[in-house]
């Protein structure tokens, strides 16, 4: 029951900071969230890929070709890890600059969101109370049927299901009524929040477009700086890949040549 109210509160009020609001944790920056997800994904791909390479090399065909893919894979992952370490501070700087430039707008929107959240909290509390009462009423109606089933024989199962069906439909219909009522109560505040956001953006536009143009110019500037600072790391990645690719090509050509010799000798 609490999960329903929690979900609604998260949906209407907390947005991307829901974890911080409910758990009182320090909110992660956008870069921290992206970095964590990317790290988990890359590590999973890396470990999974290495397992496949190891399985192939252990196979009869892998042993016959002797491509040394596992050594090349380890070299590749080491190079990618080095690239990630080099680019990490650069991308962190980009996110820090972007957050700094939009701090005022984010503070204003957070203030609006907090105000709306306080106004709709009574409606959420009322919904929680009504939902609890409906569930308790349903439990009271179902309890005698459960006792009847325990006391009766198996053939009464169908009869019990027939009795439970209308009760379940009644609970669903009454829940829909409460949800619709809650939606109607929250609608004005949702519209109000949208209007405030539109007003904030309109104010930026009416400022001669200077503020929006400034945001765009600064974002472009930060992206250009990120691109320039990442070039050396990307070049290091390319240079690191060349020996790996060359080793793979030599091993593959040697394996093909060996196979051709065996065919000609037959």
UniProtKB/Swiss-Prot annotation:
UniProt modification remark: Glycosylated.
**Region forming the signal peptide:** 1-18
Keyword list (alphabetical) reads:
Cholesterol metabolism, Glycoprotein, HDL, Lipid metabolism, Lipid transport, Lipoprotein, Oxidation, Palmitate, Phosphoprotein, Repeat, Secreted, Signal, Steroid metabolism, Sterol metabolism, Transport
Chain segments carrying region 10 X approximate tandem repeats: 67-266
**Pfam families membership:** Apolipoprotein (PF01442)
Record's subcellular location: Secreted
Modified residue annotations for Methionine sulfoxide: 109
Per its UniProt record, what Gene3D superfamilies does this chain match?
A: 1.20.5.20, 6.10.140.380, Apolipoprotein (1.20.120.20)
Instruction: Mark the transmembrane ranges.
Output: none
> Which tissues does it occur in?
Major protein of plasma HDL, also found in chylomicrons.
User: One GO MF term, please?
Assistant: phosphatidylcholine-sterol O-acyltransferase activator activity
Give any single GO term for biological process: positive regulation of phospholipid efflux
| GO CC terms in record | chylomicron; endocytic vesicle; extracellular vesicle; low-density lipoprotein particle; spherical high-density lipoprotein particle; very-low-density lipoprotein particle
Q: How does it assemble?
A: Homodimer. Interacts with APOA1BP and CLU. Component of a sperm activating protein complex (SPAP), consisting of APOA1, an immunoglobulin heavy chain, an immunoglobulin light chain and albumin. Interacts with NDRG1. Interacts with SCGB3A2. Interacts with NAXE and YJEFN3.
Cited function: Participates in the reverse transport of cholesterol from tissues to the liver for excretion by promoting cholesterol efflux from tissues and by acting as a cofactor for the lecithin cholesterol acyltransferase (LCAT). As part of the SPAP complex, activates spermatozoa motility.
Q: Which family does it belong to?
A: Belongs to the apolipoprotein A1/A4/E family.
Question: What is this protein identified as?
Answer: Apolipoprotein A-I
Source taxonomy:
Eukaryota, Metazoa, Chordata, Craniata, Vertebrata
**Gene behind this protein:** APOA1
